[in-house]
Design a protein with these regions (language model features):
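Acidic, metal-coordinating helix/loop segments flanking the phosphotransfer/catalytic sites
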Residues: 31-51
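Active-site residues of response regulator receiver
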Residues: 55-56
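Two-component/phosphorelay signaling modules centered on CheY-like receiver
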Residues: 12-31
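Acidic catalytic/metal-coordinating carboxylates
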Residues: 34, 62-66
Length: 122
């Protein structure tokens, strides 16, 4: 299965770690540091991705929830996994959908979640 993941993470160290982890899992990984870059990639390549892995707090006007809504508008089949180092109201996930992991990340759990989501997308 050729599964593509879009990673949106503003912390360069975390982004690099996620890239390496997911590439080592055999996934096609595209990563961007911010919302504007994510919107640009999605506008051109949204159908390519089976999974969006996005930080919630990106230090900009848009957050991971905004990116997820845009991604789903362009690719209804995309699965979303949110990550954050900050507390998030669980009711927000009930309305937004998607899976959620807190930082620091359990890399084995993350890899399993991405593969499960990628498998459902195909």
């Amino acid at each position: 299965m050729n599964s593509s993941v879009l990673v949106v993470e503003d912390d360069p160290n975390v982004r690099t770690m996620l890239d390496e982890l997911l590439q080592d899992q055999g996934l096609d990984v595209w990563s961007v540091p911010d919302d504007l870059s994510a919107y640009q990639v999605l506008s051109q390549e949204a159908k390519r991705f089976s999974v969006l892995l996005t930080d919630i707090n990106l230090g900009s006007d848009s957050d991971g929830f905004d990116i997820a809504r845009r991604a789903r508008g362009l690719n209804a089949g995309i699965h979303v996994i949110f990550i954050s180092g900050y507390p998030v109201d669980p009711r927000r996930f009930a309305s937004e959908g998607g899976a959620f992991l807190t930082k620091p990340l359990d890399l084995d759990v993350l890899a399993g979640m991405v593969w499960a989501a990628a498998g459902e997308a195909h």
